[in-house]
Amino acid sequence: MRLTRLKTENFRNLAAVDVTPAPGVNVIYGENAQGKTNLIEAIYLLTGQKSFRAAKESDYLRFGQEVARIEAEFTCQNREKTAALAYGSKKLAWLNGVECAPSELTGEFLAVVFSPGELALIQEGPSERRAFLDGAISQVMPRYMTTLAAISRILLQRNTLITDMQKSGNAAMMEPLLETWDRSLAKVAFSICHARARFIRRLAPPAAEIYMDICKRADQPFFLSYQPSIPAPQGADWADVSPAEGEAHIRAALAAARSEDYKNYCTTLGPHRDNMEVTIAGISARNFGSQGQQRSCALALKLAQCRVMEETLGEAPIILLDDVLSELDKTRRDYFLHGEHPGQVFITCCDRGAARTLGEGAAFRMKEGQLYLPAKRAKKRKEP
């Protein structure tokens, strides 16, 4: 996977960027608040995923502008492709020049981002880990996004119905309609549980290996487990359950939880309550891990995701390292800076020193939303 050209127009503070990155490592350096993270964000949005930053799409527009655009030329599986996004009164997307739903970019443009906020993956609640898991699955199985959209709609309808039933005082008359929603929910819930269990089964071994490689502590094994709010039938793993058995089991669980649903005016069981537990030496990394251990766990998960993507798709994703280089040990810094990762890498940092230790690749300076190319690569503008 290689980004061969990137253009932005009126995206956040970025001026008209038009850059041809190096095929290996690309270092973007500059002082804080110059636009480095904005550039990384622009690249990541081309995956069709939500931004890794807490932001509204209206924030993407440069002050005083009505439309922001991101355009890319890239190669994937030896095929040249293009992708584009536009943000204005509505969000638009194009793939190979043809307008499409933004979600259709998922699985076409492959990238994994590391940012200072990645600690939330370990430190925060289950929703952070579900989001990571669902985003990772979507990049290797794009149709999974349709399933996620479906369960969101079904849960909204089911929760609305439960509220109406409680307020009407005539819940019994409405139970047949609730059972209809239960059948719909069971179908998509099984698909999600099955996909999550299968992905975690593939993710866990490389994550444990990478964590061990980072920490060098054989007495602190890393373990990853799926903790669904509805356990699989008969103690099985959801990855091994058939659709018929799984859907019937989920319908029964929903029926058993109905009184609890009525009490809480919402659906209390389902994939929206799942967790992915990370433990070190059998102890919760979230509750008892040091910040260093938590950072290593997050890095191990992300690098394992890259490995699973490469094994599944035959293509190494682009790695985006946003202001995290200083948090990595020398071995990991060298891994990225010296081109040991099989794919393309973009690294942002404040210190120009990273550019000096760069192996084969390119260094760029970001200043006030302008990207300055090295003299030997510049066409119109040299670094001041």
Where on the chain are the PLM-derived regions?
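Conserved NTPase motor "head" modules and their coupling/switch loops across ABC/AAA+ ATPases, GTPases
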Residues: 1-31, 172-318, 327-331, 335-338, ...
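Conserved lysine of the Walker
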Residues: 35-36
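Helix-to-loop junction immediately C-terminal to a conserved catalytic motif
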Residues: 44
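Nucleotide-state sensing region of NTPase/ATPase domains
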Residues: 47-128, 132-144, 205-209, 253-259
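Structural recognition of the conserved hydrophobic beta-strand(s) that form the central parallel beta-sheet
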Residues: 72, 344-351
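A conserved P-loop NTPase coupling/switch region
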Residues: 104-108, 115-187, 374-377
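Walker B catalytic acidic pair
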Residues: 322-324
